[in-house]
């Protein structure tokens, strides 16, 4: 199979993965309108092509929170990454590390923080949910700091889990889910051998270490379902801001007023995100929400964006809409599932090449030159 894009990796991942895992990463909330709009709205962003400029010297690098990135891209936190490839968090993190960009470790990962961090040459980022179990939150923060994680990504758009219809149909949840997952694994022997057997343990590493006992997929659903906290407010985040010594990003911002609140709170950055269309169907796509947020807080706080990004061209579009950098989620999981670390490395190489092509054809030689001036203004 010829692989030349994240779309190709998606097809390859679908062939390799049991349906419950493919649809868990591929699906969204409710009827998935926002999931589709994330991609479609970004694809509708037209850029101004400029020609006959000397573009022989391009620089895709940026400085972000004191770190030098080879391109304006970071890997988003994705729960259960270690179910998509053998010790998947390690493989994805190594690929990001080799390409000179940050990997964000999910707090609900398969591999624990301590398994991943020592294998990298640069600090990784760490993501945390708002949970009723404040003991777990504090334990995770302490371990992340001890492991040298540089930046905290605090996800605030999951006070309750989204309604994901696909999960019930695919076997991730619903009646006889465990039996259905087992039957699917038998029908996908390459995954069953490489990940199902050789990728053990399939604990949720960070939660298991806190609870002192193994936590599998059923425990994952039960623990999170019981611990999401709908009472959370900005006040509840104050102890985290005081405890965490490094940069702190608030993930899940879609409204300019929330972005202004993040500035007042003292966050170092925000991530414009609708959780990849996995939480509330019918909200704005990140591409549509971003310009108003940038108008409200640009220059006061760093702005990152995810949801719908599938190519280097999409990265350039997001930056032109107002972001300082973009984050990849599904795209790298498709590559990881299809080809492990080498797949993620290859995808990131494609992303960087696509960024360079877009910069050349819009006549910008550095990321700082990608502004709203690149956007085609409709009459």
From Swiss-Prot:
Residues 1-379 form the FMN hydroxy acid dehydrogenase domain. It is an enzyme of class 1 (oxidoreductase). InterPro entries: Aldolase_TIM, Alpha-hydoxy_acid_DH_FMN, FMN-dep_DH, FMN_HAD, FMN_hydac_DH_AS, LldD. One of its GO terms (biological process) is aerobic respiration. The keyword ATP-binding does not apply. It is found in: Cell membrane. It catalyses: (S)-lactate + A = pyruvate + AH2. PROSITE patterns: FMN_HYDROXY_ACID_DH_1, FMN_HYDROXY_ACID_DH_2. Keywords: Cell membrane, Flavoprotein, FMN, Membrane, Oxidoreductase. Its cofactor is FMN. The active site is at 275 (proton acceptor). It is a peripheral membrane protein. GO terms for molecular function: FMN binding; L-lactate dehydrogenase activity. Pfam families: FMN_dh (PF01070). FMN binds at residues 106, 127, 155, 251, 306-330. Belongs to the FMN-dependent alpha-hydroxy acid dehydrogenase family. Catalyzes the conversion of L-lactate to pyruvate. Is coupled to the respiratory chain. This is L-lactate dehydrogenase. It comes from Alcaligenes faecalis. The lineage of its organism: Bacteria, Pseudomonadati, Pseudomonadota, Betaproteobacteria, Burkholderiales.
């Amino acid at each position: 199979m010829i692989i030349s894009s994240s779309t190709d990796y998606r097809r390859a991942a679908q062939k390799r993965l049991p349906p419950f895992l493919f649809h868990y990463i591929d699906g969204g909330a409710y009827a998935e309108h926002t999931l589709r709009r994330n991609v479609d709205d970004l694809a509708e962003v037209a850029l101004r092509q400029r020609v006959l400029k000397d573009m022989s010297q391009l620089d895709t690098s940026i400085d972000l929170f004191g770190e030098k990135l080879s391109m304006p891209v970071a890997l988003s936190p994705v729960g259960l990454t270690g179910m998509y490839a053998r010790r998947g968090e390690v493989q994805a993190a190594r690929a990001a590390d080799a390409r000179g960009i940050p990997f964000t470790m999910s707090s609900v990962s398969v591999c624990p923080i301590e398994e991943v961090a020592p294998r990298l040459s640069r600090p990784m980022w760490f993501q945390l949910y708002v949970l009723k179990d404040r003991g777990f939150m504090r334990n995770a923060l302490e371990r992340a700091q001890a492991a040298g994680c540089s930046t905290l990504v605090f996800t605030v758009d999951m006070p309750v889990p989204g309604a994901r219809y696909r999960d019930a149909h695919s076997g991730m949840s619903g009646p006889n889910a465990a039996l259905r997952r087992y039957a699917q694994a038998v029908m996908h022997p390459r995954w069953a051998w490489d990940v199902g057997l050789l990728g053990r343990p399939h604990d949720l590493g960070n939660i298991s270490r806190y609870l002192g006992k193994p936590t599998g997929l059923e425990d994952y659903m039960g623990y999170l379902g019981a611990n999401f906290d709908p009472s959370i407010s900005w006040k509840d985040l104050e102890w985290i801001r005081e405890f965490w010594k490094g940069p702190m990003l608030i993930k899940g911002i879609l409204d300019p007023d929330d972005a202004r609140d993040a500035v007042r709170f003292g966050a170092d950055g925000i991530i414009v995100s609708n959780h990849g269309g996995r939480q509330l169907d019918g909200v704005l796509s990140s591409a549509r929400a971003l310009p108003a947020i940038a108008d409200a807080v640009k220059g006061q706080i760093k702005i990152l964006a995810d949801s719908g990004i599938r190519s280097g061209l999409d990265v350039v579009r997001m930056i032109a809409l107002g972001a300082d950098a973009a984050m990849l989620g599904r795209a790298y999981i498709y590559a990881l599932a299809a080809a492990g670390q080498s797949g993620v490395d290859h995808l990131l190489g494609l992303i960087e090449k696509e960024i360079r092509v877009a910069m050349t054809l819009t006549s910008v030689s550095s990321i700082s030159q990608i502004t709203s001036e690149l956007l085609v203004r409709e009459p």
